[in-house]
Amino acid sequence: MEFDTIAAISTALGEGAIAIVRVSGDDAVEKVNRIFKGKDLTEVPSHTIHYGHIVDLDTNQVIEEVMVSIMRAPRTFTRENIVEINCHGGLVSVNKVLQLILAQGVRLAEPGEFTKRAFLNGRIDLSQAEAVMDLIRAKTDRAMNVAINQMEGRLSKLIGRLRQDILETLAHVEVNIDYPEYDDVEEMTHNILIEKATHVRAEIAKILETSKQGKILREGIATAIIGRPNVGKSSLLNSLVQEKKAIVTDIAGTTRDVIEEYVNVRGVPLKLIDTAGIRETEDVVERIGVERSKEMMSQADLVLVVVNYSEALTNEDEELFRAVQGKDFIVIVNKTDLPQAIDMERVIELAAGNRVITTSLIEEQGIDELEKAIADLFFEGTIDSADVTYVSNARHIGLLTQAGKTIGDAIEAIENGVPIDMVQIDLTRTWEILGEITGDTVHESLIDQLFSQFCLGK
């Protein structure tokens, strides 16, 4: 496949030691060589780095001191010639280098276009391409490992094997229908077809079993910290984040807005939401914060309910317990360094079988137990991202669910005695749906939409 030559800044914009401008295309080396003062880049071997300067051809002025990496097709990310220019970080210098490259007839790359070319040129499939963005956005080591496994093709291989099984079954059916006189080909009976289709459905279900945990590792657990004012919600957030992100004071109602922070809890990414203290209030600003807190609580995957060990339960406390019924929640009884005034038996009763953990955040007690409880709740205490192929992408989960239903329709049709040639339709559709995961049967408009979500220069 032939494309024009593209370029973009591949590092984050801002001040830094190094910035990288990436160029990809058949004539990438020749275009960069025009503005490079140093070795003739068209003569150097592939996968080598060269020192020199970028020069403005109009003024013959040296613009930047650079190191240039030359990587020749097909052993590159895009399977095209790639040049990467390492220059000093900073908005002015790196943008000037980019502008000089574009002046040589190179086009500014669209978001995700380098990865899109890697896909279109057969370097990676669509699920591997999507994993590139997952790797960039990974919040924990576990999430990073899941993305790397997908980039290396672990999910692709599973899907490929399923599609091959279906294809072989379809071919067998075709031979039976078109060439019934062939005695050396086993007859595809309803029983054999049910066995093969059931195997495919079971494998799809097995992959989908990892989807809840996979989605958590990819997107995090939306976790709302709720409680009356001054029970220690912001202190809990700070203890988990291990930095002073929220303002902590002894004045009730200090947190008037919703504070969000990602935190790594034993490999699980938590999107922590510290909410304004929920209570009746006449303060307009505080009341807005309270309403937003209630909204965030309803959207959360996990709720941490904080109550005060040194105070008796109030009607507001009990109302919070009623509000979280039906959700995953953990109760934190904070301030155990103070004299007890709370009725712990009542707390356990209101928790309705959910974990109750006592803490003294000021003395840094109870956080380890809380982190373990969170990991136990969602992963039964273990996360084996190295050996398990997690499916974490919502698009993949949707397609696998759809494929499972379609193959289920095929099994039902076979059991009801529908002619085998009619069952082919559902089998073929299942094969096509699974192909959408890897990009083998996907529409071009979807490809464009997926890659438009990537960052520029990737």
From Swiss-Prot:
Gene Ontology MF, one: GTP binding
What coarse category fits the chief subcellular location reported for this protein?
cytoplasm
Keywords attached to this Swiss-Prot or TrEMBL record, sorted alphabetically, are: Cytoplasm, GTP-binding, Hydrolase, Magnesium, Metal-binding, Nucleotide-binding, Potassium, tRNA processing
- Enzyme Commission identifier(s): 3.6.-.-
Q: Can you tell me which residues the record assigns to a coiled coil?
A: none
Query: Record-annotated residues binding (6S)-5-formyl-5,6,7,8-tetrahydrofolate?
Result: 22, 84, 123, 458
Q: Which Pfam families match?
A: MMR_HSR1 (PF01926), MnmE_helical (PF12631), TrmE_N (PF10396)
Q: Which GO terms describe its cellular component?
A: cytosol
Q: Which PROSITE patterns match?
A: G_TRME
Q: Which cofactor does it need?
A: K(+)
> Where found, per UniProt?
Cytoplasm
The UniProt note on the cofactor reads as follows:
Binds 1 potassium ion per subunit.
The EC class name is hydrolase
Residue positions binding Mg(2+): 234, 255
What are the BP-aspect GO terms?
Answer: tRNA methylation; tRNA wobble uridine modification
This protein's source sits in the domain of life called Bacteria
Sites binding GTP sit at: 230-235, 249-255, 274-277
Quick one: which residues bind K(+)?
Answer: 230, 249, 251, 254
Where the record annotates domain TrmE-type G, the positions are 220-379
Q: Into which family does the record put it? A: Belongs to the TRAFAC class TrmE-Era-EngA-EngB-Septin-like GTPase superfamily. TrmE GTPase family.
**Reported function:** Exhibits a very high intrinsic GTPase hydrolysis rate. Involved in the addition of a carboxymethylaminomethyl (cmnm) group at the wobble position (U34) of certain tRNAs, forming tRNA-cmnm(5)s(2)U34.
Subunit (UniProt): Homodimer. Heterotetramer of two MnmE and two MnmG subunits.
Q: What is this protein called?
A: tRNA modification GTPase MnmE
Source organism of the structure = Bacillus cereus (strain ZK / E33L)
